[in-house]
């Protein structure tokens, strides 16, 4: 073949392979870009539009199936709309499911009255939903959430604690800043360091700084160690009921979680072992009288626009769904 003809054919092939967009979605696309302040280069715009459209149509199909009773939760377009699921998992999840020093083991209370529902938000234990940004620091937000709750239980004062302090300063304990970490390592840092600064004094940047700027005079919390829970939902329920919010890790790597909006989250593909995201259980409850409608109230760190005002109801007592009881722990204060 004549080389020039070959190049012409190749270029025509590329042109014909360019994505064809659904013009009926133009207004929604432009609105989404404006809402989330997206500015793309010429070469990226088409690719991102194609990813966004694919996600939009997947969400619409899921919600049609929800209306037919096939799912127990809805999905919605959100800030992750132009990300493939692979990108989403790389950027947003940062729990490192690695071997580490264990804490004390939780001793389940034998005679405690365990209520059918608990919500520590109503008791003042929980700070507003935060946003980790595009930094794999979920572990830090889960850890501060549990420590904020335990400090409130001890002092009666709710103080927002510094995730950036943990991101910058806990590498000696095994954490890797925006590249991931463990809540237990964060609790160990607070004990080793003798304190953790307040959010106000050490604000969140959403990036690695390589410099620890901890100021002892701004410390707003301390801990004496941490306790690991047995890998059972009943143990998690007893801990949440009697102690307050508990740090947990889950498998959050699915598109169904990426675009979760409301209802009780259940995905049959969710793993109880492959954990990638640190979150905070702040309570539990049930809908109606059906025993299958029990849920955990889980605080996420993707901002209040995601999910149920920043929270997700996760299926409870469904064989440790998404591994919610696999790596649960809390700090002792």
Curated annotation (Swiss-Prot):
Binding positions for Zn(2+) 7 per the UniProt entry: 276
Residues that hold Zn(2+) 2 according to the record: 163, 199
Name of the protein in question: Procathepsin L
Binding site for Zn(2+) 4: 210
Enzyme superclass (EC): hydrolase
Record key words, sorted: Cell membrane, Cytoplasmic vesicle, Disulfide bond, Glycoprotein, Hydrolase, Lysosome, Membrane, Metal-binding, Protease, Secreted, Signal, Thiol protease, Zinc, Zymogen
Propiece residues: 18-117, 290-291
Binding annotation for Zn(2+) 3: 184, 228
SUPFAM superfamilies: Cysteine proteinases
Entry membrane topology: Peripheral membrane protein
CDD domains named in the record: Peptidase_C1A
Chain's role: Thiol protease important for the overall degradation of proteins in lysosomes. Plays a critical for normal cellular functions such as general protein turnover, antigen processing and bone remodeling. Involved in the solubilization of cross-linked TG/thyroglobulin and in the subsequent release of thyroid hormone thyroxine (T4) by limited proteolysis of TG/thyroglobulin in the thyroid follicle lumen. In neuroendocrine chromaffin cells secretory vesicles, catalyzes the prohormone proenkephalin processing to the active enkephalin peptide neurotransmitter.
Residues annotated as the enzyme's active site: 138, 277, 300
Keyword Membrane attributed: yes
Record SMART domains: Inhibitor_I29 (SM00848), Pept_C1 (SM00645)
Positions that bind Zn(2+) 1: 122
């Amino acid at each position: 073949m004549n080389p020039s003809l070959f190049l012409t054919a190749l270029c025509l092939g590329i042109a014909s392979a360019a994505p064809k967009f659904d013009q009926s979605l133009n207004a929604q696309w432009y609105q989404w870009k404006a809402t989330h302040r997206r500015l793309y280069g010429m070469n990226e715009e088409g690719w991102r539009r194609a990813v966004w459209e694919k996600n939009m149509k997947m969400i619409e199909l899921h919600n049609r199936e929800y209306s037919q009773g096939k799912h127990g939760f809805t999905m919605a377009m959100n800030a992750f709309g132009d990300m493939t699921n692979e990108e989403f998992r790389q950027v947003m999840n940062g729990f490192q499911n690695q071997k580490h020093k264990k804490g004390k083991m939780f001793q389940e209370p034998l005679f405690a009255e365990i209520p059918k529902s608990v919500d520590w938000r109503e008791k003042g234990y929980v700070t507003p939903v935060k946003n980790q940004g595009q930094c794999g620091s979920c572990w830090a937000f889960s850890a501060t959430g549990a420590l904020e709750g335990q400090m409130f239980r001890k002092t009666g004062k709710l103080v927002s604690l510094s995730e950036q302090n943990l991101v910058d300063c806990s590498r000696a304990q095994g954490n890797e800043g925006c590249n991931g970490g463990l809540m237990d390592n964060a609790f160990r840092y607070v004990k080793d360091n003798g304190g953790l600064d307040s959010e106000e004094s050490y604000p969140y940047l959403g990036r690695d700084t390589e410099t620890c700027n901890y100021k002892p005079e701004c410390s707003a919390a301390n801990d004496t160690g941490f306790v690991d829970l047995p890998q059972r939902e009943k143990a998690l329920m007893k801990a949440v009921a009697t102690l307050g919010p508990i740090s947990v890790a889950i498998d959050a790597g699915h598109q169904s979680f990426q675009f979760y909006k409301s209802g009780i989250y259940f995905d049959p593909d969710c793993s109880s072992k492959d954990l990638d995201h640190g979150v905070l259980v702040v309570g539990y409850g049930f809908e109606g009288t059906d025993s299958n409608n029990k849920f955990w109230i889980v605080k996420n760190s993707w901002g209040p626009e995601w999910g149920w005002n920043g929270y997700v109801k996760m299926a409870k007592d469904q064989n440790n769904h998404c591994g919610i009881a696999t790596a649960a722990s809390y700090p002792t204060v």
